[in-house]
Amino acid sequence: KAGYRNFDTAEGYMNEKDLGEGIKRAVHDLGVKREELFVSTKVWNSHRGYDKTLRAFDESMKKLGLEYLDLYLIHWPAVARWHDDWREINRSTWRAFEQLYREGRVKAIGVSNFLAHHVRALTEDGDIKPMVNQIE
């Protein structure tokens, strides 16, 4: 009703299910077309790495009730608290992002709060460059 069309959420915000319910109401009750919406979410630090990232994506999609995502972001660069080797965990997470993008499940992939050396490592290690670096 208010006209919002851009929704930025994250696994860590714990509101994906609520947003999904709002999107469902907008589409079904108000006639808003899914194509008119831009929805982004982010994978949390504890769900990093290839397999965990794919599972986290599926869970986010289930909560959001969507068939595709407009933008998927790695929420934070890996830090020692969560992972010993930041470059390797970013690389394996990014491989999962590239797969989701190639499969058409995500229209754009990127990162959030990454410093220049983190982005540089992804461009060196991956096939697809990050399309967005969302800075807090």
What label would you give each PLM region?
Residues 1, 49-65, 115-121:
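Short, acidic/polar
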Residues 10-18, 46-51, 80-81:
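Acidic-and-aromatic substrate-binding clefts and catalytic sites of carbohydrate-active enzymes
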Residues 53-74, 99-103:
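CE4/NodB-like, metal-dependent polysaccharide N-deacetylase domain
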Residues 1-37, 67:
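N-terminal binding-site loop/beta-alpha segment at the start of enzyme catalytic domains
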Residues 76-136:
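Beta/alpha (TIM)-barrel catalytic core signal, keyed to glycine-rich beta->alpha loops juxtaposed to Asp/Glu
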Residues 25-35, 64-66, 101-105, 125-129:
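Short helix-capping segments at alpha-helix termini
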